[in-house]
Amino acid sequence: MVCNSKKSETESPRGRPALRTGFSSGTAAAAAAVAALRYLISGTSARAIAVKLPSGLYLGVPVETCSLRDCVASAFVIKDGGDDPDVTNGAQIIAKVALLRNDPEKMCGKNPQPPQIILCAGKGIGTVTKPGLPALPGEPAINPTPRQMISENISLELLRLATFELEGLQDKACDVSDTSLCAEKAALRLPLNANAKAKTVLGPAGTFSLLIEIEAPRGEELAKRTLNPRLGITGGLSILGTTGIVRPFSHEAYEQTIHAAFSVASSTCAKTVVLSTGGKSEKLARQRFPELGPEAFVQIADFFSFAVREAVMLGFSRIIHSVFFGKAVKMALGYPYTHAHAAPMDLQFLAATARSLGHKEQLCQRLSLANTARHGLDIIAEDGSFDIVEKIARTAVEQSVRVADEASRAAVASQSAPIRIRLLLFDYDGNLLAEAGKEA
């Protein structure tokens, strides 16, 4: 079955305009690689490529241009993330493909070199420098699923090409010294999972292999707006994707990002992670904990419970939350996910907290009628009743401890000592209002 990438939309609740899905950078890279191979071998310039996804479905991906220079064919695809607000949306993903003559000595020796795919990162594609990520240090930042997609779709294209009468392959091939592809960065060697008929395109007895370089012309610039610098990915973007499809505002994608950040922190032997909801709360926490490495600071957005569970499962012994008042209230309410669409602010809870501390009913009524959490905090500050803030902080920590305990019980190997959890609660000007939990 072939899906049209231009018409794939998510269902729209309550009559809101549907959000259009798109395709991942991994799908874009696979499409570009197939288009370049087709142009190199057959001279056909594809307008679109049907990319086989991990699910087994096919997705039609438009191809912008194909070209040939010397022995290297190029094709580029514009990454279309649909309505997902990703910085790579609209980025050019280019694949350059060359037919590489295999070393005759290896071919004729006891261990003949089989046809293979040599895949590397070109301009604007990052290189992994830290452990804890799906790709190993020194490898191109091309994740396992995109690697598999490139390998499988190239193999399928070779099978398609094998049905044609192809001539002059020797004239299309080059030696390593004839091309600058993969000259500066580490390369991956991927198996060519093609049947014998498909491999005949690469000549008798594995005469040729395929050299594929993936580029993103603006990748280094765009990567500065991603988590790559923090994750230790240098020089550009990552080629990502687990399904090949990008779903707008995907929870799964953000959870994978949090998990990756934790994995990097764990690989540095960090025992503490500082969970912030965004850049400002992270900056405030960094000022308080200059002794912690940059990997220890993880922005979790609204994924409160997920982040705590992941931290426990990965064996961290201390969690520090850095939050503003509104998020602290939602944490105290026990919301696992604190985004406004899923977790409406309950200011009656704020009023009930004030009552439990013996405050006058007039203050409690004002809090119950506040417009926002920020407004509620202004009322508290005006009254000088900061014990309410401290109570909210303590309750938020209790909820975090509850989530951590549940995760510990669910883990195969529970931690020998309870995880220590601490919370720093800031006002909207960056002043520390309250601390709660262990070490507070």
Regions found by a protein language model. Name each.
Residues V2-C182, L188-R189, A198-R225, P229-L231:
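Generic N-terminal targeting/processing segments that precede catalytic cores or assembly contacts
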Residues K106, K130, A223, L284, ...:
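Generic domain-boundary/flexible-linker signal
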